[in-house]
């Protein structure tokens, strides 16, 4: 809350704060975070709605009141909030859609994660939406994995490292440093993991600037969302500087020109 309050003070009206209950990692690490040594309490996920309300209150000028033995204390993310960042609830299930609707918050569906259940979750959110003072109408956007290159063949090659990482995550393998395009090509995916990789890639936007722009517009229209968030996932090749991501920069540059 403090970090986003600072960003909002520096760039008022330009900051979005997304809150989700998933830790964004493999099942073993997720268990360790929630239950293992030093992790949060077992009921932390169940208390997620309370956490959302607390963060929203801390960002507001009024703050959140905490009752202690010494009296009621007010916590604020910043001493003098003149504006607050837009709060978006993140999710990939009916649970998150219902919670966002109940709290009258904008909703982000993690379409990049599985690509399944998108229409159902968004319809549920809109049907059950309860207007709030800050957000009288439902607001939605999708997240999409995108790789764009001058040719389809190059885009497909650049997608390989992230696909391999996602296959490892889905099949319970330990997470490691992402491979280079050349390394994935040399390793070659087995038949089983190759099928899984192709299924995931089919839900991504991988192609030329023109085809990618058309596909993103089609997704936005199909699901009736207000915005689409592009997640550039193009990998690196041998010789790429470790502090740069030229293939991801290329994705954004080419896509921006095609959408202009």
Describe each model-derived feature in a short phrase.
Residues 1-63, 107, 115:
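Flexible, glycine-rich active-site loops centered on histidine and acidic residues
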Residues 38-76, 117-226:
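An alpha-helical appendage that flanks or caps ligand/catalytic pockets
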Residues 93-116, 121-122:
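A conserved active-site cap/scaffold subdomain adjacent to cofactor or substrate pockets
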Residues 11, 101-108, 163, 224:
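Glycine-enriched alpha-helix->loop->beta-strand junction motifs that scaffold or abut catalytic
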Residues 208-260:
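Long, low-complexity C-terminal extensions of enzymes
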Residues 20-24, 92, 112, 143-147, ...:
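Active-site beta-loop-alpha junctions enriched in small/polar residues
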Residues 14-18, 86-88, 106-108, 139-141, ...:
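Structural preference for beta-strand elements that scaffold enzyme active sites
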């Amino acid at each position: 809350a403090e970090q986003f309050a600072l960003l909002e003070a520096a760039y008022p009206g330009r900051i979005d704060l997304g809150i989700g209950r998933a830790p964004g990692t493999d099942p073993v690490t997720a268990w360790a975070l929630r239950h293992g040594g030093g992790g949060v309490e077992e009921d932390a996920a169940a208390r997620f709605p309370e956490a959302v309300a607390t963060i929203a209150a801390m960002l507001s000028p009024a703050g959140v009141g905490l009752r202690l033995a010494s009296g009621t204390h007010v916590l604020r993310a910043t001493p003098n909030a003149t504006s607050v960042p837009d709060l978006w609830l993140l999710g990939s299930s009916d649970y998150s859609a219902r919670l966002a609707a109940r709290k009258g918050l904008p909703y982000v569906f993690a379409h990049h994660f599985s690509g399944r259940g998108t229409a159902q979750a968004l319809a549920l959110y809109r049907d059950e939406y309860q207007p709030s003072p800050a957000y009288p109408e439902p607001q939605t956007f999708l997240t999409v994995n995108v790789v764009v290159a001058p040719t389809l063949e190059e885009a497909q090659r650049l997608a390989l490292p992230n696909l391999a990482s996602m296959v490892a995550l889905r099949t319970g393998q330990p997470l490691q440093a992402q491979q280079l395009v050349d390394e994935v090509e040399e390793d070659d995916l087995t038949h089983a993991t190759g099928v899984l990789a192709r299924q995931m890639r089919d839900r991504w936007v991988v192609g030329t600037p023109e085809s990618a722009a058309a596909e993103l517009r089609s997704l936005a229209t199909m699901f009736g969302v207000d915005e689409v968030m592009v997640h550039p996932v193009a990998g690196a090749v041998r010789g790429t500087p470790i502090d740069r991501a030229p293939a991801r920069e290329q994705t954004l540059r080419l896509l921006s020109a095609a959408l202009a």
